[in-house]
Structures are given as structure tokens and as C-alpha cells.
């Protein structure tokens, strides 16, 4: 039986490719998609979900827009990475359908309530919507199998020296998720910076030759430009968000450790830092499965294989 999932995302080039991967995978049943503000403004990320589902011919999937700002902070966006639309690069279709009138939290709650089995939540943006769901519906916690997030890092930052972008945008929300008691799987920068797509991989995707693989290649052409800055020391572009979906499909290509994770919400230099108790120094029981390594070639091969689904 296919694994039921809800995707909460802020597209974003890598979010868009995570959607492409999920919807090409019969092992997964995408029950709902909700949008969060982050990579771009809430209006643009919602529109980008609708544009991607229009492209993928999946208007049957319920979509709802989420919180317009973090729980306790003003919104920060990453338009320097993802461009004016949030998905700059390819010519994407205009949305062919409308989102649901309710909120992301209402759609998530309804989806959990109606599911006959626990649902996995995949969250590839800031954790605002998921935290609001957890706080407002404690009765539904048992219906959540796990929460798989792209966010955080052990000892790295890509927005500040200490913090990864998604967690930095709403650290209070991320702390609620990590301390919820629900199993959390964390794809942080330690693994996503190893899940790099190289120029040759982009050409491999382009050569698959269907309309979706072509768009993915064009998304990556744009995404690659930001990551050419020599400060990163990257060969290619790190494909952060698809690591969440890839872990659900092929956990064997990832190396993980079970650790306690907390989120710093106060620090002068460390706001938004995920504090991973790697050496078990706190005495706290592990609350997260933390990805630390990936077989890069296996990751690229999985993407290439699933892009052929759209032939």
C-alpha cells in the first residue's frame, strides 16, 4: 500500500523538484499540499504550488495556503536564491485551478482525520504550518506517523554562520516540531550539501527529453547560478528538499544517526541554530533521526529514473 503523505512547502526550485519526485513515485500517495512563506512571499509560494501541479496535471490534489508570517517574527524571504517569482528560469503554466478556501492547518487536520492510517508530513520550508497544526490539534498527533523536514544542520549555516534558512525563518516553530514527541527525520545541510547536482547531471536530465525533465533541467540551470559563488566551494548545486522524498523512497542511500535536537531561539549569534547532541552530552533521549551522509550517485540516479515516469 502506498505511504500517505502531506507535503508542506515553499516553492522554491528544490521544493518544486521534490514535488516532481513525489508525484512520480507510486510508493507515495500525496494526500494534500500546503504552502508556507519562505523562499518567496506567501502569495507567490502558493501560486507556485498551483503552477507545478498544473504542469504535472494533478489538479486533483487538494491545496491550501498557510501562515503568512512566522509565529513570532517578521518574514524573511530568499528571493536572492529563487528569483522574483520563486521559480525563475523555465516558462511554467499559469494555475489551472484554485486552492481550497480553508487554511493549510485546516486542510492538514482534515486529511489526518479522514486517513485510515497515520500520515507522514513532509515539510520542506519553515515549520510554521506544522507547528500551528501540532498546537491546535493535539488530538491528531497520533495520526501523524512522522515529520520529515528539510532544515537545520550540525555545526553549519547557510543564512547565518550558525543557522540554516528554513529554521532561521521560524525557530520557535521548529522547536515546537522537534519537542512534539512525534518522530522527526531531519535532512539538514550536512546531507543536502552532499546531494549536489553537477552540470553533467543537469544534461542527463535534459536528455531524458520529456516536458517535465526539460523543466527540471531549466530550474536547475537557474538554481546553479547562485551556487557558483566560490564562497560555497560547491561543484554543483545542493538539492536540499528532494532529500526528504528520496529518504522515504530509498532510505538505504542515506546514513542517519538518532540524536536529540533542540533549536536556539534566543542567541545573539546562534538564533535558528539546530543544536544536535551528537555525543549524548545532555542526557536527553534522541528525538530525531538526523541524516548525515548520502550516496550522491544513488540520489542522482533516483531522480533520473523517476523523471522517466513523465514520458
Swiss-Prot record:
Keywords: Glycosidase, Hydrolase
Coiled-coil region: none
A GO MF label: purine nucleosidase activity
Transmembrane segments: none
EC number: 3.2.-.-
Similarity annotation: Belongs to the IUNH family. RihA subfamily.
Function comment: Hydrolyzes cytidine or uridine to ribose and cytosine or uracil, respectively.
Record's protein name: Pyrimidine-specific ribonucleoside hydrolase RihA
Organism in which the protein naturally occurs: Salmonella paratyphi A (strain AKU_12601)
Gene designation: rihA
Amino acid at each position: 500500500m502506498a505511504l500517505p503523505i502531506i507535503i508542506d512547502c515553499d516553492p522554491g526550485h528544490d521544493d518544486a523538484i521534490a514535488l516532481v519526485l513525489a508525484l512520480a513515485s507510486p510508493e507515495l500517495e500525496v494526500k494534500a499540499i500546503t504552502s508556507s512563506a519562505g523562499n518567496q512571499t506567501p502569495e507567490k509560494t502558493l501560486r507556485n504550488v498551483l503552477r507545478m501541479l498544473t504542469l504535472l496535471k494533478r489538479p486533483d490534489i487538494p491545496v491550501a495556503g498557510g501562515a503568512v508570517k512566522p509565529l513570532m517574527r517578521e518574514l524573511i524571504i530568499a528571493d536572492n536564491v529563487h528569483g522574483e517569482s520563486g521559480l525563475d528560469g523555465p516558462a511554467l503554466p499559469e494555475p489551472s485551478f484554485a486552492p481550497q478556501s480553508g487554511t493549510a492547518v485546516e486542510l492538514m487536520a482534515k486529511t489526518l482525520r479522514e486517513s485510515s492510517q497515520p500520515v507522514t508530513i513532509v515539510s520542506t520550508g519553515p515549520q510554521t504550518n506544522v507547528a500551528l497544526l501540532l498546537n491546535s490539534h493535539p488530538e491528531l498527533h497520533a495520526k501523524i506517523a512522522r515529520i520529515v523536514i528539510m532544515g537545520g544542520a550540525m555545526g553549519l549555516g547557510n543564512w547565518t554562520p550558525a543557522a540554516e534558512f528554513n529554521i532561521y525563518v521560524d525557530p520557535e516553530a521548529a522547536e515546537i516540531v522537534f519537542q512534539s514527541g512525534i518522530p522527526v527525520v531531519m535532512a539538514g545541510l550536512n546531507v543536502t550539501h552532499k546531494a549536489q547536482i553537477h552540470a553533467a547531471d543537469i544534461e542527463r536530465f535534459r536528455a531524458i527529453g520529456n516536458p517535465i525533465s526539460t523543466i527540471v533541467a531549466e530550474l536547475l540551470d537557474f538554481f546553479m547560478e547562485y551556487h557558483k559563488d566560490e564562497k560555497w566551494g560547491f561543484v554543483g548545486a545542493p538539492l536540499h528538499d528532494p532529500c526528504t522524498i528520496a529518504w522515504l523512497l530509498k532510505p538505504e542511500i542515506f546514513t542517519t544517526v538518532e540524536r536529540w535536537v533542540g533549536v536556539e531561539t534566543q542567541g545573539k549569534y546562534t538564533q535558528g541554530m539546530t543544536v544536535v547532541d551528537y555525543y549524548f552530552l545532555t542526557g536527553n533521549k534522541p528525538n530525531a533521526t538526523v541524516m548525515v551522509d548520502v550516496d550522491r550517485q544513488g540520489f542522482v540516479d533516483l531522480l533520473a529514473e523517476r523523471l522517466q515516469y513523465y514520458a
